[in-house]
Swiss-Prot record:
Processing and modification events after translation: Contains DL-beta-methyllanthionine, when coepressed in E.coli with the flavecin synthetase FlvM2.
Protein name: Lantibiotic Flvbeta.b
Principal subcellular localisation of the protein: secreted
GO cellular component: extracellular region
GO terms for MF: signaling receptor binding
Function: Lanthionine-containing peptide antibiotic (lantibiotic) only active on Gram-positive bacteria in synergy with Flvalpha.a. Is not active in absence of Flvalpha.a, which is encoded by the same operon than Flvbeta.b. The bactericidal activity of lantibiotics is based on depolarization of energized bacterial cytoplasmic membranes, initiated by the formation of aqueous transmembrane pores.
Propeptide part(s) removed at maturation, as residue ranges: 1-34
Subcellular location field: Secreted
Residues carrying 2,3-didehydrobutyrine: 39, 43
Domain of life: Bacteria
Keyword annotations: Antibiotic, Antimicrobial, Bacteriocin, Lantibiotic, Secreted, Thioether bond
Any one Gene Ontology BP term: killing of cells of another organism
Species lineage: Bacteria, Bacillati, Bacillota, Clostridia, Eubacteriales
Length: 67
């Protein structure tokens, strides 16, 4: 599954927790860069809001977090 598909599934899971505008703002503000792996660009807020995924906060771009 590519990063865009993962992000779309995550977005769908979060759709019930906030408005589309709030989710768009949250995701836009927390992207570290287009070339970064998705698991490194999502912040801890999404970590707390999701299950089944091991997301790393932007500040925790470490080897153990990326693997």
């Amino acid at each position: 599954m590519d990063n865009n598909t993962k992000l779309q599934k995550l977005y769908e899971q979060l759709a019930a927790t906030g408005s589309e505008k709030e989710l768009d703002a949250m995701l836009d503000e927390n992207m570290a860069g287009a070339g970064s792996p998705l698991t490194v660009t999502i912040t801890g807020l999404i970590v707390a809001a999701t299950t089944g995924f091991d997301w790393c906060p932007t500040g925790a771009c470490t080897y153990s977090c990326r693997v």
